[in-house]
Amino acid sequence: MKKKANARTVAKYIFLAATIVICVGLCVGSLLPGETSAATSDNFGGAVEGVLDDIGVSTGDVMDGTGFTDWQLFVRKLFGHFGAFMFLGAVASVTFMLFSKDSTRSRLAAFGMAAVFGFSFACLTELLQTDLFTTGRGASFDDVITDCRGYFITCLLFFAVWFAAIILKHVAAKRRYGALLSSAAADEYERDPSAQDKA
């Protein structure tokens, strides 16, 4: 039991550190000047395009049905917003789970805080792109929505699996407890002649 508690404590702070690192990285990316950010996206987009060419897939096929016609913009939205926040959603969700207590109220609070954190951080990263903090960029609520879509896909998935596992564990425990009570009652019945006479 003590080893399990120690492992949970270590995991808590590992995931907390990972969440902080990801958040710092996203904030730094948001603070990049427009020219630097565009150049970084272009380089990354070119690298992805090269990989697709090697396997015989065109960028047009990838963007088909997405509403995008600009490959660099598509890559920026997919990886810089949706994908990055999807990864953050997974790590942050586990962090909130690990810091929750063993009660329904605490677990629901963890989910609520994870949801508020995801939306708030998406808004913050867009705020950092305004002229108050950097140059050549601008905030977009559409990007906040894209960020939240990525974040909440993994957040909802992880919490759904977590809650389902807890419910199944409780159901299994009740069944085991019921089986033990039935077994104990049967043993008592066999040992008590008066109970058998009454039956």
Indicate where each model-derived feature is located.
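Bulky hydrophobic segments
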Residues: 1-136, 148-199
